[in-house]
Structure formats: C-alpha cells, structure tokens
Amino acid sequence: MQGVQAQIEDLETKLAFQELTVEELNQEVIKLNRLVAHQQHQIHMLIGKLQDMEPSNMATQAEETPPPHY
C-alpha cells in the first residue's frame, strides 16, 4: 500500500508544480497582451501622424529629371 500512497503523493506534487507553471505562464501572456496592445496603439498614432503630414515639395524619383550624361 505504501507504493500506491507514494505514487499518489508524487502525482499531487507534480500537479501542484504544473498548476504553478500554468499560473506563471498565464501572467506572462497577460503581460505580453498588454505590451502588444500598447504597441498597436503607438502604431496607430504613427500612422495618423504620417497621414497628417504635408506632402513633400521634393519630386519623387519617377518625377525627377535624369542627371546629365558627361
């Protein structure tokens, strides 16, 4: 009977460690989700700033006249 009791105790110990690991991983996922949400907010703000910028007075490469050949 002691063998069965030892196995039960071993399983209970393993379960306790697994529950702790699951909780630690859950906290890490929560932290990463907050970080992703913050980064998404920053990206949306940058997109808005880029869209609000005045177009540049410089010509694009397609509009630029080719350099003279020497």
UniProtKB/Swiss-Prot annotation:
Pfam families linked to this entry: SlyX
InterPro entries per record: SlyX
Signal peptide limits: none
Parts of the chain that traverse the membrane: none
Family: Belongs to the SlyX family.
Protein name in the entry: Protein SlyX homolog
Gene: slyX
